[in-house]
Amino acid sequence: MAVGKNKRVSKGKKGGKKKIVDPFLKKEWYTLKAPVMFHVRNFGQTLVSKTQGTKLATDGLRGRIYEVSLADLNADEDQSYRKIKLCCEDIQGRNCLTNFHGTSVTRDKLCSLIRKNYSLIEAFTDVKTTDGYTLRMFCIGYTKRRPGQLKSTCYIRSSRTRVVRRKMIEVMQREASTTSMREVVKKIIPESIGKEIEKACKSVFPLQNVLIRKIKVLKKPKFDLTKLMEVHTDISEETGHATKVEESEEAANLLTKELDAQEA
């Protein structure tokens, strides 16, 4: 009988089955901390690969940009039309300290403002804040009917449009160049810059729905940990005030006795 290979017996594959490793075992979670300007400080968590050799986990986190709705940061649904960008600048323990990196308005909000028979006016300018940030601010506004107007349309002439645009740029530069980044963000949340533009342009042509459409951070100053900690620490107004400590009656009586003894 000839000895040969049995063709019916199938060979097993080389290496066999590989073990399925869960990729999340090599990763860890970090908490995201928002600056003091917002009410909700812990706004989420982020995932990063664990430190392996010379590759540190913190290096993978620095510079990450997170886009969050202002409604989530301030716990107010009325502010859901604005999006805030926060950039991770430093890591302390398992906390990622973020700072403001820009803002924009949602598309559905912009589409809801567009109306028939009204003019749209836009302007933008580059501003440098007192703490060294260079911002590019975009403003948008719409014409408004004058009281008692009978005409159905509310269009603006190109000559007046140029004047309104000039006033928009002046207000944006005045409001942002004289304050720090922290104060600029505080002005954007309640739309106070838009209200100032409406007041300034009232004499030229009445405007409505004026708001800062977008802010881009073009240039940042050199990283300083102390300045970042100032943004993340809430300094109460009461610090630094002198407090008057009332003396007890016994202490006052002892003092008068000593003075009487010295005089005698």
From Swiss-Prot:
Keywords: Cytoplasm, Ribonucleoprotein, Ribosomal protein. GO terms for cellular component: cytosolic small ribosomal subunit. InterPro entries: Ribosomal_eS1 (IPR001593), Ribosomal_eS1_CS (IPR018281), Ribosomal_eS1_euk (IPR027500). It is found in: Cytoplasm. Its main location: cytoplasm. The keyword Ribosomal protein applies. Disulfide bonds: none annotated. One of its GO terms (molecular function) is structural constituent of ribosome. Pfam families: Ribosomal_S3Ae. One of its GO terms (biological process) is translation. Belongs to the eukaryotic ribosomal protein eS1 family. Component of the small ribosomal subunit. Mature ribosomes consist of a small (40S) and a large (60S) subunit. The 40S subunit contains about 33 different proteins and 1 molecule of RNA (18S). The 60S subunit contains about 49 different proteins and 3 molecules of RNA (25S, 5.8S and 5S). This is Small ribosomal subunit protein eS1.
